[in-house]
């Protein structure tokens, strides 16, 4: 069985998920919906991907420049089994009525409230909870990053305190900032902690800052342990955790710039670093407290989760079979 997949919103996340879908033997990319005929729409067409207008209201935009569309989102929904909604935050909830009317399963992204879906999802943490579901939310890039490493040590966790150092904008985003400031999120906790709790039931508090960079987020994590764990134990656990990589400052990984360069050296599409990067030297245990620092490529870490969510929703594979297939297809190192 090949699941027929549509994508609503072919931008930073949508185009990456579209690429990932095209690499799966059990999925077929049927088409993508766009609001305007920008360079991403033209590129999709060049790749042979059918392009639809996200609404009848947007059709004139395409007609004005002679961009031939296949139809509208409603037409696309008639041809797919599942729609991946990669529209800006808040739009997914508005779009849900369309998906329900069409009788199509849907995957939402982390910009939506948890209430939009039946389950919030990170594959290695709660794959089984998405089995057979109609509506699944893949949590945000930051929440995915936190969940991957914390889930690996969840049996040792008493309480987590984490600081999110967030990138200001994606590389192609000219509308967001700041450019010359550090912007704190003065609400405590930031939304990331409660979001982690929608996936794994742990005690966690988070704070967040936005800084003038585009490459990656960085998390400073402190964990109060409820039972003994050594630095060597943590290193071994992370070494054996899928979609988590250890990077060493000693080998030149001084910053997020080198992590992105590493992804470029792997010839990854859009220099995707699907894996969460933990600096090995930062892993430290002092008494009952564990510390570590990790980096999150906000443009790509959620991509494999979308693929695994599709398999779970259609019960195409069990957890580790799906993760293995996704990892292999995308060149994820482990």
UniProtKB/Swiss-Prot annotation:
PROSITE patterns: GAPDH
Primary localisation category: cytoplasm
Subunit field text: Homotetramer.
SMART domains: Gp_dh_N
Entry's family note: Belongs to the glyceraldehyde-3-phosphate dehydrogenase family.
Gene Ontology MF annotations: 4-hydroxy-tetrahydrodipicolinate reductase; glyceraldehyde-3-phosphate dehydrogenase (NAD+) (phosphorylating) activity; glyceraldehyde-3-phosphate dehydrogenase (NADP+) (phosphorylating) activity; NAD binding; NADP binding
Cellular component terms per the entry's GO annotation: cytoplasm
Name used for this protein in its record: Glyceraldehyde-3-phosphate dehydrogenase
Record-annotated active site: 141 (nucleophile)
Record-listed NAD(+) binding positions: 12-13, 111, 167, 298
Gene3D superfamilies per UniProt: Dihydrodipicolinate Reductase, domain 2, NAD(P)-binding Rossmann-like Domain
NCBIfam families noted in UniProt: GAPDH-II_archae, PRK04207.1
Enzyme class: oxidoreductase
Binding-site list for D-glyceraldehyde 3-phosphate: 140-142, 192-193
Underlying gene: gap
Gene Ontology BP term (one): lysine biosynthetic process via diaminopimelate
UniProt pathway: Carbohydrate degradation; glycolysis; pyruvate from D-glyceraldehyde 3-phosphate: step 1/5
A Pfam cross-reference name: DapB_N
Catalytic activity: D-glyceraldehyde 3-phosphate + phosphate + NADP(+) = (2R)-3-phospho-glyceroyl phosphate + NADPH + H(+); D-glyceraldehyde 3-phosphate + phosphate + NAD(+) = (2R)-3-phospho-glyceroyl phosphate + NADH + H(+)
EC number of this enzyme: 1.2.1.59
Subcellular location: Cytoplasm
């Amino acid at each position: 069985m090949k699941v027929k997949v549509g994508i609503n919103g072919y931008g930073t996340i949508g185009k990456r998920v579209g690429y990932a879908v095209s690499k799966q033997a059990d999925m077929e990319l049927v088409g993508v919906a766009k609001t305007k005929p920008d360079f991403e729409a033209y590129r999709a067409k060049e790749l042979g991907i059918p392009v639809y207008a996200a609404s009848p209201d947007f059709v004139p935009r395409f007609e004005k420049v002679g961009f031939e569309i296949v139809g509208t989102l409603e037409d696309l929904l008639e041809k797919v089994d599942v729609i991946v909604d990669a529209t800006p935050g808040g739009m997914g909830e508005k779009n849900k009525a369309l998906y329900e009317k069409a009788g199509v399963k849907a995957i939402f992204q982390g910009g939506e409230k948890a209430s939009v879906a039946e389950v919030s999802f990170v594959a290695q943490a709660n794959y089984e909870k998405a089995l057979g579901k109609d509506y699944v939310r893949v949590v945000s890039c930051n929440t995915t990053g936190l969940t991957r490493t914390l889930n690996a040590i969840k049996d040792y966790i008493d309480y987590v305190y984490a600081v999110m150092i967030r990138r200001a904008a994606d590389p192609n985003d000219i509308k967001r900032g700041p450019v010359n400031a550090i912007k704190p999120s003065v609400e405590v906790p930031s939304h990331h902690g409660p979001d982690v709790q929608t996936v794994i039931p742990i005690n966690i508090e988070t704070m967040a800052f936005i800084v003038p960079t585009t490459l990656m987020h960085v998390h400073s994590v402190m964990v109060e342990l409820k039972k003994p764990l050594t630095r060597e134990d943590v290193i071994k656990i992370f070494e054996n955790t899928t979609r988590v990589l250890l990077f060493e400052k000693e080998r030149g990984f001084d910053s997020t710039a080198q992590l992105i360069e590493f992804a470029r050296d792997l010839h990854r599409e859009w220099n995707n670093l699907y894996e969460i990067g933990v600096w090995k030297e930062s892993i430290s245990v002092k008494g009952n407290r564990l510390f570590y620092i990790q980096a999150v490529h906000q443009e790509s870490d959620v991509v494999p989760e979308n693929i695994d969510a599709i398999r779970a929703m259609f019960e195409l594979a069990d957890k580790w079979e799906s993760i293995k297939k996704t990892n292999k297809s995308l060149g994820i190192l482990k």
